[in-house]
Regions:
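Hydrophobic/aromatic-rich core segments of domains that either
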Residues: 152-201
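Generic structural signal for hydrophobic residues
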Residues: 47, 118, 156-157
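Secondary-structure boundary elements
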Residues: 83-142
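Generic recognition of cysteine residues
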Residues: 19-22, 55, 150, 161, ...
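Linear, non-domain "peripheral" regions
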Residues: 1-98
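Solvent-exposed loop/turn segments at secondary-structure junctions
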Residues: 82-83, 125-129, 148-150, 174-178
Length: 201
């Protein structure tokens, strides 16, 4: 079953998809700024957020500013990075190594076994962060520090599922915290992190 790494990208119109692609590439390359199609600030903010839901490995930028020039069809987006570029590369390498090391332990399991491996890893190694410590909303909190809020845990599950080629999205809700949704053998599984169980949806 294919991973759902572009789930939110696929929900966008063509112009928004162009902006998504440029922003994602700019963030992956750690560019100081890049030109994106001119969209409303809300659209750009939404796209920036959705990239981080599709690609939780982009944990090092959560905000941006932009400049618009008269008579231009583009805006210059300026990402705000949480760390220096050198530190981002170090953290990124550490997270990639951690994810690959964990995935190797489960790669020979069937899909349900992989899902249970991820579940057990999260339950045994990640504490819910009531104090909302630094980076607890990102994979670096869950996989690096062992503490995270629902969003950080859902992102950790997503990045592990992507590595193991399990379909998974981070479900968004205004009323409830983010949750990871996995599709295993024609059923959908919701990760309920407070109850520490997987439920069939």
């Amino acid at each position: 079953m294919a991973k759902a790494s572009n789930y939110y990208y696929d929900q966008l119109n063509k112009e928004q998809q162009r902006a998504y692609y440029v922003i994602k590439e700019g963030l992956l390359k750690l560019q100081d700024s890049f030109a994106v199609p001119m969209l409303s600030k809300k659209e750009l903010s939404d796209i920036y957020f959705l990239i981080r839901m599709d690609c939780p490995e982009i944990f090092y930028s959560v905000n941006f500013s932009y400049r618009h020039y008269a008579d231009s069809t583009m805006v210059e987006m300026i990402p705000q990075y949480l760390f220096s570029k050198e530190k981002i590369r170090e953290h990124r390498q550490a997270m990639e190594s951690r994810v690959k090391k964990l995935a190797r332990q489960a790669e020979k399991l069937d899909e349900l076994g992989k899902e249970l491996f991820i579940h057990d890893f999260i339950v045994d190694n990640v504490k819910y962060d009531k104090l909302k410590k630094e980076y607890s909303h990102e994979i670096i909190g869950a996989l690096g520090n062992g503490v995270a809020v629902c969003e950080g845990i859902a992102k950790a599950v997503k990045v592990l599922c992507d590595e193991l080629n399990i379909w998974c999205i981070i479900a968004l809700s205004e009323a409830n915290p983010e949750k990871g949704i996995l599709r295993v053998e024609y059923s959908h599984q919701q990760i309920s992190l407070h109850e520490r169980v997987f439920r069939t949806a």
